[in-house]
Curated annotation (Swiss-Prot):
The gene is AKR1A1. Pfam families: Aldo_ket_red. Changing residue 300 to C: No change in enzymatic activity. This is Aldo-keto reductase family 1 member A1. Changing residue 113 to Q: Strong decrease in enzymatic activity. The keyword Lipid metabolism applies. The lineage of its organism: Eukaryota, Metazoa, Chordata, Craniata, Vertebrata. Its EC number is 1.1.1.2, 1.1.1.372, 1.1.1.54, 1.1.1.19.
Length: 325
């Protein structure tokens, strides 16, 4: 069953459910991608920093293309430019590395992963002596211009942003000749992102939700944090509709026309996550789920400095999460 799609301003159809691959280990991700394709997924979300693009590429080579299970034009593949590759000279080589790893001739969507740049080079997390990150002064507007050249060369069909706030999106729009088509951010009922979604939709951007299930498998999880999949409203709806809590969270998003990229390597869950197009919540039920919002952000990159866990980039002038949205 092919997932329903949203139409990007480029004319591309982007499936509302994709397979997320963050934290999918090499050794497991190839089988997950092959299984997802076999049950109807047509959207795979990747990133250079996830360290598993070569293995995803093996799956794509086996199953995608002329005479194979999935025609290339039916598949939507996203990847992301890492923070160490923001310098305009580094953008095309970074993309070409991703294309080589994924064994593709073009990407459907290429995102700037974060608004700020790290020091150039091959160390993905360059550090100062005190353990803090070494940043680079390249501004995202310069990076954007280099990304636009990739579209002109036919290497990328659409561009987008990840982890940008509303002000930064408008900043990009002020210089863009190729307008961003998608914003990818953390989003789930605890972090509903209503203002940011409205901001994007008013400007012709679609929104992709990462960690749509609340990302309880993160290494730095706080034992006291709320668990979205155990929320009583979610459990009650799961019982009513005979669905899993995960399916309830995903249905809420697709009913708002928000794209979701739940990560799984478990076949039963991969299958479950795409089966969210055959039931519909009432307006009242949508309201109940909307009411869970507490602006709770699970994904804040952390560092240990002097034995304490601190937000890694919060002091950077381009850090996106200091603004209201």
């Amino acid at each position: 069953m092919a997932a329903s799609c949203v139409l990007l301003h480029t004319g591309q159809k982007m499936p509302l459910i994709g397979l997320g691959t963050w934290k999918s280990e090499p050794g497991q991700v190839k089988a997950a991608v092959k299984y997802a394709l076999s049950v109807g997924y047509r959207h795979i979300d990747c990133a250079a920093i996830y360290g598993n693009e070569p293995e995803i590429g093996e799956a794509l080579k086996e199953d995608v293309g002329p005479g194979k299970a999935v025609p290339r034009e039916e598949l939507f593949v996203t990847s992301k430019l890492w923070n160490t590759k923001h310098h305009p000279e580094d953008v095309e080589p970074a993309l070409r590395k991703t294309l080589a790893d994924l064994q593709l001739e073009y990407l459907d969507l290429y995102l700037m992963h974060w608004p700020y740049a790290f020091e150039r080079g091959d160390n993905p997390f360059p550090k100062n002596a005190d353990g803090t990150i070494c940043y680079d002064s390249t501004h995202y507007k310069e990076t954007w211009k280099a990304l636009e050249a990739l579209v002109a060369k036919g290497l990328v069909q659409a561009l987008g942003l990840s982890n940008f706030n509303s002000r930064q999106i408008d900043d990009i729009l002020s210089v863009a000749s190729v307008r961003p088509a998608v914003l990818q951010v953390e989003c789930h009922p605890y972090l509903a992102q209503n203002e940011l979604i409205a901001h994007c939709q008013a400007r012709g951007l679609e929104v992709t939700a990462y960690s749509p299930l609340g990302s309880s498998d993160r290494a730095w999880r706080d034992p006291d944090e709320p668990v979205l999949l155990e929320e009583p409203v979610v459990l009650a709806l799961a019982e009513k509709y005979g669905r899993s809590p995960a399916q309830i969270l995903l249905r809420w998003q697709v009913q708002r026309k928000v794209i979701c990229i739940p990560k799984s390597i478990t076949p039963s869950r991969i299958l479950q996550n795409i089966k969210v197009f055959d039931f519909t919540f009432s307006p009242e039920e949508m309201k109940q789920l909307n009411a869970l919002n507490k602006n709770w952000r699970y994904i804040v990159p952390m560092l240990t400095v002097d034995g304490k866990r601190v937000p890694r980039d919060a002091g950077h002038p381009l850090y996106p999460f200091n603004d209201p949205y």
